[in-house]
Regions:
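Sec/Tat-exported extracytoplasmic proteins
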Residues: 14, 19-22, 26-29, 61, ...
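Pocket-lining segment of extracytoplasmic ligand-binding domains
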Residues: 33, 87, 97-186
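Ligand-binding clefts/hinges and TM-proximal coupling segments of bilobed small-molecule sensing domains
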Residues: 80-91, 155-225
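An extracytoplasmic/periplasmic, membrane-proximal ligand-sensing/linker region
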Residues: 108-117, 121, 125-136, 141, ...
Length: 252
């Protein structure tokens, strides 16, 4: 499910957990305060750091090599108010670019790239994104030049042939994704959430070997500061102390 929709559902109390791109929070915070009386930065807390999600800018146009060349081009940015669309807005503003934005989902956008109806598409997701793995050599990634403003928001990253067989190494940016919950002290909910967190930590090796490749580079053991959900932070700290003392936690 889309990260922007996720945080909206969390704020409305319709879900207990939400996977969120951190750059999305700035966009939705004011709207959620107005529509749901939900203060994202005070009432939403990080349960678990996940991994970096790369910004993919993909084209079949051989003349589009740098992001600056997207000026006035027709570019799919994902469904309206989606995480990809919001990240695309930040990205394009950072480069002071104007494009003809099309709000197509990734699979629709790929079809239109093949037919020539679109010049490029922007999508944010942890590489490798399954929809992009089997593209042919007529596709390539558009390079993102260094940008001091964007580097305050995103992390510099490279995607290339080691991830996608059709892609040469290309500079891009990535955004951290996290699992968030509402600040609350319901004992049953806290216990359930802690059990889930423990299950993830205990099965990290299985996730590394059989899950998405991003699990191998995840940040799930990193402890969040004031933005962290206290019951989750407690679990992470206990794991760190025990493993630091030479103990290995196993499920009975």
């Amino acid at each position: 499910m889309d990260p922007s929709i996720n945080i909206n559902l969390l704020g409305a109390g319709k879900v207990d957990l939400a996977i969120v791109q951190l750059d999305v929070l700035k966009f939705v915070s004011e709207l959620m305060q107005k529509e749901a009386d939900f203060n994202v930065f005070e009432q939403a807390k990080v349960v678990l750091n996940l991994y970096l999600e790369e910004i993919h800018v993909i084209t079949r146009n051989e003349g589009l090599l740098s992001l600056y060349q997207l000026e006035d081009k027709k570019v799919a940015v994902g469904p309206q108010r989606s995480g990809s669309a919001l990240s695309a807005e930040v990205l394009l503003a950072g480069y002071d670019l104007r494009v003809q934005a099309v709000f197509d989902a990734p699979n629709d956008a790929l079809g239109k790239l093949k037919s020539g109806e679109l010049d490029a598409m922007i999508f944010v997701g942890g590489a490798p994104v399954p929809a992009f793995e089997n593209l042919d050599d007529s596709f390539h990634l558009v390079r993102m030049p260094a940008n001091n403003v964007l580097e305050q928001i995103y992390r510099k990253q490279k995607i290339g042939r080691s991830v996608y067989s059709w892609a040469d190494d290309s500079e891009t940016y990535a955004v951290p994704s996290v699992i968030m919950t509402r600040e609350r002290n319901d004992r049953e909910c806290v216990a359930t959430l802690q059990k889930l967190l423990i299950a993830i930590l205990l099965n990290k090796e299985t996730l590394d070997s059989t899950g998405h490749p991003k699990w191998k580079n995840s940040f799930i053991r990193s402890i969040v500061g004031n933005a962290g959900y206290r019951p989750a932070v407690d679990v992470l700290q206990i794991f760190d102390v025990l493993e630091g003392s030479g103990y290995r936690i196993i499920k009975k």
